From Swiss-Prot:
Organism the protein comes from: Streptococcus thermophilus (strain ATCC BAA-250 / LMG 18311)
Designated name of the protein: tRNA dimethylallyltransferase
Known catalytic reactions: adenosine(37) in tRNA + dimethylallyl diphosphate = N(6)-dimethylallyladenosine(37) in tRNA + diphosphate
Molecular function in Gene Ontology: ATP binding; tRNA dimethylallyltransferase activity
Named cofactor requirement(s): Mg(2+)
Keywords: ATP-binding, Magnesium, Nucleotide-binding, Transferase, tRNA processing
Gene name of the record: miaA
Coiled coil, from the record: none
Subunit record text: Monomer.
Region (Interaction with substrate tRNA): 35-38
The protein's role, per its UniProt record: Catalyzes the transfer of a dimethylallyl group onto the adenine at position 37 in tRNAs that read codons beginning with uridine, leading to the formation of N6-(dimethylallyl)adenosine (i(6)A).
InterPro entries on file: Dimethylallyltransferase (IPR039657), IPT (IPR018022), P-loop_NTPase (IPR027417)
Length: 299
């Protein structure tokens, strides 16, 4: 029998953390972070990490598991998430994965890994084709497909497009999970308003100080490339005003949210819920109760 688990996905700033905690309390669950930035210790504000109070309300896994100068990959996530799921289930609890890093979630749930089915000649031919494109053309292609990459540069763009193109030919190990994937969504303008408000709130909470510490100590680290930090570096170096840097941060976050939604719609089987609906979140609770074959709210 496959292990049932819940996934709370969606773009940034739609309330994934709050819903995850509510579901953990309602269905006797524990949360696994599915966010590529929340693994880093000392980066709390810019990553929108669950607060100490929120973490006290439900057990959280895969938060604060790396130092800021360490790397983290989809492979690391899959390996550590699988171990966390096994541990959670062994104690009779429900695994609830909460996060917006689509590649991580898909890699875990669909069991993909690079294998012998990929024709390397085809990969090389496609790479040659991509090399003929300008940077702008590559980045437009990335955006149109909803692909998430850590850093917008040519090398990463080409690699991401290769993985996207040949993902259907990757070896697909039989997954042992039966997920119910909740996708949180709303009107685009409302999501953008929430993003803008959240950035302003992050600044009030100390984002500038957190980003400055990262800039002073680990400017080349993988963690420093995440949205929320890199946009502020030109301000610290005197290349931009604070208003310009914050506007860029809001703009990049809005674009990232759009890419996240595109990924979840095109690459995964997701049940979407409008967070502004009067029925939310009770409609989620009801659907999960059915999925888990239990009376509403009981475990």
């Amino acid at each position: 029998m496959k292990t049932k688990l819940i996934v709370v996905a969606g773009p940034t700033a739609v309330g994934k953390t709050a819903l995850g905690i509510e579901l953990a309390e309602r269905f006797n669950g524990e949360i696994i972070s599915g966010d590529s930035q929340q693994v880093y210790r000392q980066l709390n504000i810019g990553t929108a990490k669950a607060t100490p109070e929120e973490q006290a309300a439900a057990v959280h896994h895969l938060i604060d598991v790396r130092d800021v100068d360490e790397s983290y990959s989809a492979y690391d996530f899959v390996t550590e998430a699988q171990a966390a799921i096994t541990d959670i289930v062994s104690r009779g609890k429900l695994p609830i994965i909460v996060g917006g890093t689509g590649l991580y979630l898909q890699s875990l749930l669909e069991g993909y890994h690079l294998g012998g089915k990929v024709d390397q000649n085809q990969v090389l031919a496609y790479r040659s084709e991509l090399e003929q494109l300008s940077d702008q053309q590559l980045f437009e292609k990335i955006d149109s497909l909803g692909i998430e990459i850590k850093e917008i540069n040519r090398r990463r763009a080409i690699r991401a497009l290769e993985l996207y193109r040949f993902s259907d030919n990757l070896e697909n190990t039989e997954t042992c999970y039966e997920p119910f994937i909740i996708g949180l969504d709303d009107e685009r303008s409302l999501i953008y308003d929430r993003i803008n408000t959240r950035v302003d709130k992050m600044v009030e909470l100390g984002l500038l100080e957190e980003a400055k510490w990262l800039y002073d100590n680990f400017p080349e680290a993988q963690s420093a490339r995440g949205i929320g930090y890199k946009e502020l570096f030109p301000y610290f170096s005197g290349e931009q005003t604070l208003d310009e840097a914050l506007e860029k941060l809001k703009q990049n976050t809005r674009r990232f949210a759009k890419r996240q939604l595109t990924w979840f719609r095109n690459r995964m089987t997701v049940s979407f819920y409008q967070i502004s609906s009067p029925e939310y979140p009770e409609n989620v609770i009801q659907d999960l109760a059915i999925f888990l074959n239990e009376e509403e709210g009981e475990k």
